Amino acid sequence: MIAFVRANNLYLVKLLFDNSESQITVNGKFNEILNGIPDWVYEEEFGFSRAFDFSSDSQMLAYIRFDERNVPMYSFPWYKGMAPSLDQYETYPGAYEYKYPMPGIDNSKVSVHTFAIKAKVTRKMDLPLDEDGYIPRIQFTKDPNALAIMTLNRHQNRFDLYLANPRSTLCKLILR
């Protein structure tokens, strides 16, 4: 089984069952909601491009949901350049816009969800996260009933590690 993101939604492909594809999330929308794929801040600052993980028994999929609706757009100029050369901007620069939170401005609101593959049930983890907190990593442990969730506050001077039960949604603080 593999998972992938298309148009900000998560999908599963069951390789042993005629490569059937199933859509897991339906609320993904460009510049609004991202499921299983990080926003610019997470990709750049925390260095990852995949925000989902399978349980060790492959029965659950956990993912981070990014709500970037309150993050302002940022525009910067594009010039011809050399790598690659963008000939359409040889005479006049173009502009590229994307969600980019300046210091003190809202970041994406993040939450952790699990999807029970056989039951097709999605649950939101009951994680005590500051409204402007970060979730830099999630990973299932060898125990399929234990999802490790790492959190940081906005100032990144408080790190918490939680173990979440993906079925009950309860999160237990194990390290601060």
Predicted stretch roles:
Residues M1-R176:
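Beta-propeller folds
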